[in-house]
Protein backbone atom coordinates (compact mmCIF):
# COMPACT_ATOMS: atom_id res chain seq x y z
CA UNK A 1 0.00 0.00 0.00
CA UNK A 2 1.27 3.43 -0.91
CA UNK A 3 2.48 5.47 2.02
CA UNK A 4 2.07 9.12 1.28
CA UNK A 5 0.88 10.52 4.58
CA UNK A 6 2.33 13.89 5.30
CA UNK A 7 1.99 13.36 9.01
CA UNK A 8 3.77 10.14 9.82
CA UNK A 9 2.30 10.14 13.32
CA UNK A 10 -1.20 9.98 11.95
CA UNK A 11 -0.19 7.19 9.62
CA UNK A 12 -0.09 4.80 12.56
CA UNK A 13 -3.62 5.88 13.48
CA UNK A 14 -5.19 5.38 10.09
CA UNK A 15 -8.04 2.94 10.08
CA UNK A 16 -6.40 0.85 7.41
CA UNK A 17 -3.61 0.07 9.84
CA UNK A 18 -5.91 -0.31 12.80
CA UNK A 19 -8.35 -2.73 11.29
CA UNK A 20 -6.54 -6.04 10.93
CA UNK A 21 -6.74 -6.58 7.25
CA UNK A 22 -5.06 -9.73 6.07
CA UNK A 23 -7.65 -11.86 4.32
CA UNK A 24 -10.45 -9.78 5.77
CA UNK A 25 -13.49 -9.43 3.61
CA UNK A 26 -14.25 -6.02 2.10
CA UNK A 27 -16.86 -4.75 -0.35
CA UNK A 28 -15.77 -1.82 -2.50
CA UNK A 29 -18.39 0.55 -3.94
CA UNK A 30 -17.51 0.68 -7.63
CA UNK A 31 -18.80 3.50 -9.81
CA UNK A 32 -16.69 2.54 -12.82
CA UNK A 33 -14.37 5.52 -12.23
CA UNK A 34 -10.66 5.62 -11.48
CA UNK A 35 -10.99 6.40 -7.77
CA UNK A 36 -13.05 3.38 -6.81
CA UNK A 37 -11.11 1.14 -9.24
CA UNK A 38 -7.83 2.07 -7.60
CA UNK A 39 -9.34 1.59 -4.14
CA UNK A 40 -10.23 -2.00 -5.03
CA UNK A 41 -6.83 -2.70 -6.60
CA UNK A 42 -4.87 -1.23 -3.66
CA UNK A 43 -6.88 -3.24 -1.18
CA UNK A 44 -6.19 -6.41 -3.15
CA UNK A 45 -2.51 -5.59 -3.25
CA UNK A 46 -2.67 -5.14 0.49
CA UNK A 47 -4.07 -8.61 1.06
CA UNK A 48 -7.79 -7.99 1.49
CA UNK A 49 -10.43 -10.34 0.10
CA UNK A 50 -12.20 -7.86 -2.21
CA UNK A 51 -15.63 -7.87 -3.86
CA UNK A 52 -17.12 -5.07 -5.95
CA UNK A 53 -20.60 -3.62 -5.49
CA UNK A 54 -22.22 -1.22 -7.94
CA UNK A 55 -25.50 0.48 -7.18
CA UNK A 56 -27.57 1.02 -10.27
CA UNK A 57 -28.91 4.49 -9.62
CA UNK A 58 -30.55 5.72 -12.80
CA UNK A 59 -31.72 4.60 -16.18
CA UNK A 60 -29.60 5.89 -19.07
CA UNK A 61 -25.99 6.39 -20.08
CA UNK A 62 -23.10 7.79 -18.05
CA UNK A 63 -21.15 6.84 -14.96
CA UNK A 64 -24.21 6.51 -12.70
CA UNK A 65 -25.95 4.27 -15.19
CA UNK A 66 -25.22 1.62 -17.80
CA UNK A 67 -21.72 2.88 -18.65
CA UNK A 68 -20.70 2.82 -14.99
CA UNK A 69 -22.06 -0.69 -14.53
CA UNK A 70 -20.21 -2.00 -17.57
CA UNK A 71 -16.91 -0.33 -16.62
CA UNK A 72 -17.17 -1.67 -13.07
CA UNK A 73 -17.96 -5.15 -14.37
CA UNK A 74 -14.94 -5.01 -16.72
CA UNK A 75 -12.69 -3.93 -13.87
CA UNK A 76 -13.88 -6.82 -11.68
CA UNK A 77 -13.21 -9.18 -14.56
CA UNK A 78 -9.66 -7.78 -14.90
CA UNK A 79 -9.04 -8.06 -11.16
CA UNK A 80 -10.66 -11.48 -10.95
CA UNK A 81 -13.10 -10.49 -8.22
CA UNK A 82 -16.83 -10.94 -7.78
CA UNK A 83 -19.03 -8.09 -9.00
CA UNK A 84 -22.41 -7.46 -7.41
CA UNK A 85 -25.01 -5.11 -8.80
CA UNK A 86 -27.85 -3.75 -6.70
CA UNK A 87 -30.80 -2.22 -8.45
CA UNK A 88 -31.17 0.95 -6.36
CA UNK A 89 -33.12 2.99 -8.91
CA UNK A 90 -36.32 3.12 -6.83
CA UNK A 91 -34.60 4.29 -3.66
CA UNK A 92 -32.46 6.81 -5.63
CA UNK A 93 -35.61 8.17 -7.27
CA UNK A 94 -37.34 8.53 -3.90
CA UNK A 95 -34.42 9.80 -1.81
CA UNK A 96 -32.50 11.92 -4.32
CA UNK A 97 -34.56 12.85 -7.38
CA UNK A 98 -37.81 13.48 -5.49
CA UNK A 99 -36.19 15.26 -2.54
CA UNK A 100 -34.01 17.41 -4.83
CA UNK A 101 -37.13 18.36 -6.79
CA UNK A 102 -39.04 19.19 -3.59
CA UNK A 103 -36.09 21.25 -2.37
CA UNK A 104 -36.12 23.42 -5.48
CA UNK A 105 -39.91 23.76 -5.29
CA UNK A 106 -39.53 25.06 -1.74
CA UNK A 107 -36.95 27.71 -2.61
CA UNK A 108 -33.97 25.73 -1.31
CA UNK A 109 -30.77 24.88 -3.18
CA UNK A 110 -30.52 21.18 -2.38
CA UNK A 111 -27.38 19.05 -2.15
CA UNK A 112 -28.11 15.76 -3.96
CA UNK A 113 -24.69 14.17 -3.20
CA UNK A 114 -25.29 14.38 0.56
CA UNK A 115 -28.80 13.00 0.14
CA UNK A 116 -27.35 10.13 -1.88
CA UNK A 117 -24.58 9.38 0.63
CA UNK A 118 -27.00 9.61 3.54
CA UNK A 119 -29.98 7.66 2.29
CA UNK A 120 -28.76 5.59 -0.63
CA UNK A 121 -25.06 4.79 -1.01
CA UNK A 122 -23.94 3.98 2.52
CA UNK A 123 -27.37 2.65 3.59
CA UNK A 124 -27.41 0.17 0.75
CA UNK A 125 -23.76 -0.81 1.19
CA UNK A 126 -24.23 -1.32 4.93
CA UNK A 127 -27.33 -3.48 4.39
CA UNK A 128 -25.37 -5.49 1.84
CA UNK A 129 -22.38 -6.19 4.10
CA UNK A 130 -24.49 -6.90 7.19
CA UNK A 131 -26.08 -9.77 5.27
CA UNK A 132 -22.67 -11.42 4.62
CA UNK A 133 -21.76 -14.54 6.59
CA UNK A 134 -18.46 -13.13 7.89
CA UNK A 135 -17.79 -9.62 9.20
CA UNK A 136 -17.31 -7.45 6.15
CA UNK A 137 -15.80 -4.01 5.72
CA UNK A 138 -16.85 -1.30 3.23
CA UNK A 139 -14.58 0.81 1.01
CA UNK A 140 -15.20 3.73 -1.32
CA UNK A 141 -12.94 5.98 -3.36
CA UNK A 142 -13.81 9.12 -1.37
CA UNK A 143 -10.96 11.48 -0.52
CA UNK A 144 -11.38 11.55 3.28
CA UNK A 145 -9.90 9.58 6.18
CA UNK A 146 -11.20 7.52 9.08
CA UNK A 147 -9.09 7.02 12.20
CA UNK A 148 -9.59 5.66 15.69
CA UNK A 149 -10.07 8.29 18.37
CA UNK A 150 -7.86 6.30 20.74
CA UNK A 151 -4.93 7.37 18.57
CA UNK A 152 -2.60 9.19 20.93
CA UNK A 153 -1.69 11.82 18.35
CA UNK A 154 -5.14 13.37 18.23
CA UNK A 155 -5.20 16.82 19.72
CA UNK A 156 -8.21 17.26 22.00
CA UNK A 157 -7.53 20.63 23.57
CA UNK A 158 -11.27 21.40 23.42
CA UNK A 159 -12.18 18.36 25.53
CA UNK A 160 -14.60 17.00 22.99
CA UNK A 161 -16.26 13.72 23.80
CA UNK A 162 -14.90 11.84 20.85
CA UNK A 163 -16.76 8.82 19.51
CA UNK A 164 -14.74 5.67 18.67
CA UNK A 165 -14.02 6.61 15.06
CA UNK A 166 -13.21 10.06 13.68
CA UNK A 167 -13.78 11.28 10.16
CA UNK A 168 -10.97 13.50 8.82
CA UNK A 169 -10.54 15.61 5.73
CA UNK A 170 -8.73 13.99 2.81
CA UNK A 171 -5.00 14.75 2.77
CA UNK A 172 -5.42 16.34 -0.69
CA UNK A 173 -7.26 19.51 0.24
CA UNK A 174 -8.20 20.16 -3.41
CA UNK A 175 -10.02 16.83 -3.63
CA UNK A 176 -11.25 16.56 -0.03
CA UNK A 177 -14.80 15.10 -0.12
CA UNK A 178 -15.45 14.92 3.63
CA UNK A 179 -18.06 17.72 3.29
CA UNK A 180 -20.40 15.24 1.58
CA UNK A 181 -19.91 12.63 4.31
CA UNK A 182 -21.24 14.57 7.31
CA UNK A 183 -24.19 12.21 7.68
CA UNK A 184 -22.16 9.04 8.26
CA UNK A 185 -22.82 7.00 11.40
CA UNK A 186 -20.32 5.30 13.69
CA UNK A 187 -21.71 2.00 12.48
CA UNK A 188 -20.55 2.87 8.96
CA UNK A 189 -17.25 4.40 10.13
CA UNK A 190 -16.38 1.28 12.12
CA UNK A 191 -16.42 -0.69 8.87
CA UNK A 192 -15.23 1.98 6.46
CA UNK A 193 -11.83 1.99 4.75
CA UNK A 194 -11.00 4.92 2.48
CA UNK A 195 -7.84 3.84 0.63
CA UNK A 196 -7.40 7.18 -1.18
CA UNK A 197 -7.66 9.35 1.92
CA UNK A 198 -3.92 9.97 2.01
CA UNK A 199 -3.39 10.35 -1.74
CA UNK A 200 -3.32 13.29 -4.08
CA UNK A 201 -5.34 12.96 -7.26
CA UNK A 202 -2.15 12.87 -9.40
CA UNK A 203 -0.91 9.98 -7.28
CA UNK A 204 -4.17 8.15 -7.88
CA UNK A 205 -3.69 8.41 -11.64
CA UNK A 206 -0.05 7.30 -11.38
CA UNK A 207 -0.96 4.33 -9.21
CA UNK A 208 -3.81 3.35 -11.52
CA UNK A 209 -1.35 3.39 -14.45
CA UNK A 210 1.21 1.39 -12.48
CA UNK A 211 -1.42 -1.24 -11.81
CA UNK A 212 -2.58 -1.17 -15.43
CA UNK A 213 -6.20 -0.41 -14.54
CA UNK A 214 -8.53 0.04 -17.51
CA UNK A 215 -9.96 3.16 -15.83
CA UNK A 216 -6.55 4.82 -15.34
CA UNK A 217 -7.11 7.39 -18.08
CA UNK A 218 -10.86 7.78 -17.68
CA UNK A 219 -11.72 11.48 -17.48
CA UNK A 220 -12.76 12.93 -14.14
CA UNK A 221 -16.49 12.59 -13.56
CA UNK A 222 -18.57 15.68 -12.75
CA UNK A 223 -18.94 16.48 -9.06
CA UNK A 224 -22.65 15.85 -9.47
CA UNK A 225 -23.99 12.76 -11.19
CA UNK A 226 -27.29 14.55 -11.91
CA UNK A 227 -25.36 17.14 -13.93
CA UNK A 228 -23.61 14.40 -15.86
CA UNK A 229 -26.91 12.64 -16.49
CA UNK A 230 -29.10 15.61 -17.43
CA UNK A 231 -26.41 17.84 -18.98
CA UNK A 232 -26.84 20.61 -16.40
CA UNK A 233 -28.70 21.26 -13.17
CA UNK A 234 -30.88 23.72 -15.09
CA UNK A 235 -31.99 20.86 -17.37
CA UNK A 236 -32.75 18.67 -14.37
CA UNK A 237 -34.88 21.48 -12.95
CA UNK A 238 -36.68 22.07 -16.27
CA UNK A 239 -37.44 18.36 -16.36
CA UNK A 240 -38.80 18.04 -12.84
CA UNK A 241 -40.07 21.33 -11.43
CA UNK A 242 -43.18 23.11 -12.70
CA UNK A 243 -42.79 26.68 -13.90
CA UNK A 244 -44.71 29.33 -11.96
CA UNK A 245 -44.18 32.96 -12.91
CA UNK A 246 -43.69 35.52 -10.15
CA UNK A 247 -42.08 38.83 -9.26
CA UNK A 248 -38.49 39.88 -8.68
CA UNK A 249 -38.41 42.52 -5.95
CA UNK A 250 -35.72 44.63 -4.36
CA UNK A 251 -35.63 44.03 -0.59
CA UNK A 252 -36.75 47.68 -0.30
CA UNK A 253 -40.09 46.53 -1.75
CA UNK A 254 -39.77 47.86 -5.32
CA UNK A 255 -40.80 45.42 -8.06
CA UNK A 256 -38.01 45.17 -10.65
CA UNK A 257 -39.17 42.42 -12.97
CA UNK A 258 -40.66 38.96 -13.30
CA UNK A 259 -39.28 35.42 -13.12
CA UNK A 260 -40.37 32.04 -14.42
CA UNK A 261 -40.00 30.02 -11.21
CA UNK A 262 -37.97 30.42 -8.00
CA UNK A 263 -36.26 27.09 -8.75
CA UNK A 264 -34.11 28.85 -11.35
CA UNK A 265 -32.44 31.04 -8.70
CA UNK A 266 -29.92 30.51 -5.96
CA UNK A 267 -28.74 32.82 -3.20
CA UNK A 268 -25.83 34.99 -4.26
CA UNK A 269 -26.70 34.64 -7.97
CA UNK A 270 -25.94 37.74 -10.02
CA UNK A 271 -26.20 36.67 -13.63
CA UNK A 272 -29.42 36.00 -15.50
CA UNK A 273 -31.69 38.21 -13.38
CA UNK A 274 -32.76 40.28 -16.40
CA UNK A 275 -33.30 43.50 -14.46
CA UNK A 276 -31.91 46.99 -14.87
CA UNK A 277 -30.50 48.73 -11.78
CA UNK A 278 -27.70 51.26 -11.37
CA UNK A 279 -25.58 48.85 -9.28
CA UNK A 280 -25.10 45.05 -9.40
CA UNK A 281 -27.87 43.14 -7.64
CA UNK A 282 -27.75 39.61 -6.24
CA UNK A 283 -30.41 37.12 -5.18
CA UNK A 284 -30.87 37.70 -1.45
CA UNK A 285 -33.67 35.23 -0.64
CA UNK A 286 -36.46 33.17 -2.18
CA UNK A 287 -39.98 33.42 -0.77
CA UNK A 288 -41.77 30.21 -1.68
CA UNK A 289 -45.13 31.27 -0.15
CA UNK A 290 -45.38 34.48 -2.17
CA UNK A 291 -43.31 33.14 -5.08
CA UNK A 292 -40.99 36.17 -4.93
CA UNK A 293 -37.27 36.39 -5.71
CA UNK A 294 -35.74 39.12 -3.52
CA UNK A 295 -32.62 40.88 -4.76
CA UNK A 296 -30.23 43.24 -2.98
CA UNK A 297 -26.80 44.87 -3.03
CA UNK A 298 -23.84 42.67 -2.20
CA UNK A 299 -23.62 44.08 1.34
CA UNK A 300 -27.21 43.12 2.08
CA UNK A 301 -26.38 39.48 1.43
CA UNK A 302 -24.15 39.35 4.47
CA UNK A 303 -25.61 37.22 7.26
CA UNK A 304 -24.65 36.97 10.88
CA UNK A 305 -26.40 33.72 11.79
CA UNK A 306 -27.96 30.61 10.34
CA UNK A 307 -30.16 27.89 11.77
CA UNK A 308 -28.82 24.40 11.06
CA UNK A 309 -31.26 21.51 11.21
CA UNK A 310 -30.99 17.71 11.17
CA UNK A 311 -27.49 17.90 12.60
CA UNK A 312 -25.56 14.63 12.70
CA UNK A 313 -22.57 14.42 15.04
CA UNK A 314 -20.12 12.20 13.23
CA UNK A 315 -16.99 12.24 15.39
CA UNK A 316 -18.15 13.71 18.71
CA UNK A 317 -21.11 13.34 21.06
CA UNK A 318 -23.70 16.10 20.57
CA UNK A 319 -22.52 19.17 22.48
CA UNK A 320 -24.90 20.38 25.18
CA UNK A 321 -23.38 23.84 25.39
CA UNK A 322 -22.01 26.17 22.76
CA UNK A 323 -18.79 25.23 21.00
CA UNK A 324 -16.39 26.99 18.65
CA UNK A 325 -16.13 25.45 15.20
CA UNK A 326 -14.79 26.07 11.74
CA UNK A 327 -17.88 25.91 9.54
CA UNK A 328 -17.90 25.17 5.83
CA UNK A 329 -21.15 26.34 4.28
CA UNK A 330 -20.52 25.24 0.69
CA UNK A 331 -18.51 22.40 -0.81
CA UNK A 332 -15.87 24.62 -2.34
CA UNK A 333 -15.85 27.41 0.25
CA UNK A 334 -13.17 27.97 2.87
CA UNK A 335 -14.15 27.16 6.47
CA UNK A 336 -15.00 30.19 8.61
CA UNK A 337 -14.94 30.60 12.38
CA UNK A 338 -18.22 30.48 14.26
CA UNK A 339 -20.01 29.50 17.43
CA UNK A 340 -22.62 26.76 17.51
CA UNK A 341 -25.39 27.11 20.03
CA UNK A 342 -27.71 24.14 20.72
CA UNK A 343 -31.39 25.08 20.42
CA UNK A 344 -33.72 23.59 23.00
CA UNK A 345 -36.12 20.86 22.01
CA UNK A 346 -38.77 19.03 24.01
CA UNK A 347 -36.85 15.75 24.10
CA UNK A 348 -33.50 17.43 24.89
CA UNK A 349 -32.05 15.63 21.89
CA UNK A 350 -31.61 18.73 19.84
CA UNK A 351 -30.74 18.39 16.21
CA UNK A 352 -31.07 22.14 15.64
CA UNK A 353 -28.24 24.57 16.27
CA UNK A 354 -27.73 28.26 15.76
CA UNK A 355 -24.49 29.02 13.93
CA UNK A 356 -23.15 32.50 14.71
CA UNK A 357 -20.40 33.56 12.32
CA UNK A 358 -17.40 35.47 13.60
CA UNK A 359 -17.54 37.57 10.40
CA UNK A 360 -20.76 38.10 8.44
CA UNK A 361 -21.06 35.70 5.51
CA UNK A 362 -22.55 36.01 2.06
CA UNK A 363 -24.01 32.99 0.24
CA UNK A 364 -25.65 31.44 3.30
CA UNK A 365 -27.96 29.20 1.31
CA UNK A 366 -30.86 27.19 2.74
CA UNK A 367 -30.63 23.58 1.56
CA UNK A 368 -26.83 23.47 1.46
CA UNK A 369 -24.90 21.69 4.22
CA UNK A 370 -23.05 23.47 7.02
CA UNK A 371 -20.27 21.14 8.05
CA UNK A 372 -18.32 21.72 11.27
CA UNK A 373 -14.63 21.00 11.58
CA UNK A 374 -11.90 21.36 14.17
CA UNK A 375 -8.74 21.35 12.11
CA UNK A 376 -8.77 18.15 10.11
CA UNK A 377 -11.54 16.50 12.13
CA UNK A 378 -15.09 16.64 10.79
CA UNK A 379 -17.18 17.01 13.94
CA UNK A 380 -20.62 16.93 12.34
CA UNK A 381 -22.94 18.79 10.04
CA UNK A 382 -26.49 19.58 9.09
CA UNK A 383 -28.64 21.51 6.65
CA UNK A 384 -28.92 25.27 6.56
CA UNK A 385 -32.63 25.84 7.10
CA UNK A 386 -32.87 29.60 7.47
CA UNK A 387 -30.73 32.65 8.14
CA UNK A 388 -31.24 35.84 10.00
CA UNK A 389 -30.24 39.30 8.87
CA UNK A 390 -26.96 40.95 9.78
N1 LIG B 1 -23.11 3.76 -8.29
C1 LIG B 1 -22.23 3.49 -7.31
N2 LIG B 1 -22.18 2.26 -6.74
C2 LIG B 1 -21.30 1.98 -5.75
N3 LIG B 1 -20.43 2.87 -5.27
C3 LIG B 1 -20.44 4.10 -5.80
C4 LIG B 1 -21.33 4.48 -6.85
N4 LIG B 1 -21.10 5.76 -7.17
C5 LIG B 1 -20.11 6.17 -6.36
N5 LIG B 1 -19.70 5.19 -5.53
C6 LIG B 1 -18.62 5.24 -4.51
O1 LIG B 1 -18.55 6.55 -3.98
C7 LIG B 1 -17.26 7.12 -4.23
C8 LIG B 1 -17.38 8.60 -4.50
O2 LIG B 1 -18.29 8.78 -5.55
P1 LIG B 1 -18.25 10.03 -6.54
O3 LIG B 1 -19.51 9.98 -7.31
O4 LIG B 1 -17.91 11.23 -5.77
O5 LIG B 1 -17.15 9.56 -7.56
P2 LIG B 1 -15.69 9.95 -7.89
O6 LIG B 1 -15.02 10.72 -6.79
O7 LIG B 1 -15.67 10.51 -9.23
O8 LIG B 1 -15.06 8.47 -7.85
P3 LIG B 1 -14.88 7.46 -9.06
O9 LIG B 1 -13.64 7.93 -9.78
O10 LIG B 1 -14.68 6.15 -8.36
O11 LIG B 1 -16.12 7.52 -9.90
C9 LIG B 1 -16.72 6.34 -5.42
O12 LIG B 1 -15.32 6.36 -5.46
C10 LIG B 1 -17.27 4.96 -5.17
O13 LIG B 1 -16.49 4.23 -4.25
Curated annotation (Swiss-Prot):
<dbReference type="InterPro" id="IPR023382">
    <property type="entry name" value="MnmA-like_central_sf"/>
</dbReference>
<keyword id="KW-0808">Transferase</keyword>
<dbReference type="GO" id="GO:0103016">
    <property type="term" value="F:tRNA-uridine 2-sulfurtransferase activity"/>
</dbReference>
<dbReference type="GO" id="GO:0005737">
    <property type="term" value="C:cytoplasm"/>
</dbReference>
<feature type="active site" description="Cysteine persulfide intermediate">
    <location>
        <position position="225"/>
    </location>
</feature>
<dbReference type="Pfam" id="PF03054">
    <property type="entry name" value="tRNA_Me_trans"/>
</dbReference>
<keyword id="KW-0820">tRNA-binding</keyword>
<dbReference type="InterPro" id="IPR014729">
    <property type="entry name" value="Rossmann-like_a/b/a_fold"/>
</dbReference>
<dbReference type="Pfam" id="PF20258">
    <property type="entry name" value="tRNA_Me_trans_C"/>
</dbReference>
<feature type="active site" description="Nucleophile">
    <location>
        <position position="116"/>
    </location>
</feature>
<keyword id="KW-1015">Disulfide bond</keyword>
<keyword id="KW-0963">Cytoplasm</keyword>
<dbReference type="GO" id="GO:0005524">
    <property type="term" value="F:ATP binding"/>
</dbReference>
<keyword id="KW-0067">ATP-binding</keyword>
<feature type="site" description="Interaction with tRNA">
    <location>
        <position position="142"/>
    </location>
</feature>
<keyword id="KW-0547">Nucleotide-binding</keyword>
<protein>
    <recommendedName>
        <fullName>tRNA-specific 2-thiouridylase MnmA</fullName>
        <ecNumber>2.8.1.13</ecNumber>
    </recommendedName>
</protein>
<feature type="binding site">
    <location>
        <begin position="29"/>
        <end position="36"/>
    </location>
    <ligand>
        <name>ATP</name>
    </ligand>
</feature>
<feature type="binding site">
    <location>
        <position position="141"/>
    </location>
    <ligand>
        <name>ATP</name>
    </ligand>
</feature>
<feature type="binding site">
    <location>
        <position position="55"/>
    </location>
    <ligand>
        <name>ATP</name>
    </ligand>
</feature>
<feature type="region of interest" description="Interaction with tRNA">
    <location>
        <begin position="175"/>
        <end position="177"/>
    </location>
</feature>
<comment type="similarity">
    <text>Belongs to the MnmA/TRMU family.</text>
</comment>
<dbReference type="InterPro" id="IPR046885">
    <property type="entry name" value="MnmA-like_C"/>
</dbReference>
<feature type="region of interest" description="Interaction with tRNA">
    <location>
        <begin position="330"/>
        <end position="331"/>
    </location>
</feature>
<feature type="disulfide bond" description="Alternate">
    <location>
        <begin position="116"/>
        <end position="225"/>
    </location>
</feature>
<dbReference type="GO" id="GO:0000049">
    <property type="term" value="F:tRNA binding"/>
</dbReference>
<dbReference type="Pfam" id="PF20259">
    <property type="entry name" value="tRNA_Me_trans_M"/>
</dbReference>
<keyword id="KW-0819">tRNA processing</keyword>
<dbReference type="GO" id="GO:0002143">
    <property type="term" value="P:tRNA wobble position uridine thiolation"/>
</dbReference>
<dbReference type="InterPro" id="IPR046884">
    <property type="entry name" value="MnmA-like_central"/>
</dbReference>
<dbReference type="InterPro" id="IPR004506">
    <property type="entry name" value="MnmA-like"/>
</dbReference>
<feature type="site" description="Interaction with tRNA">
    <location>
        <position position="368"/>
    </location>
</feature>
<keyword id="KW-0694">RNA-binding</keyword>
<comment type="function">
    <text>Catalyzes the 2-thiolation of uridine at the wobble position (U34) of tRNA, leading to the formation of s(2)U34.</text>
</comment>
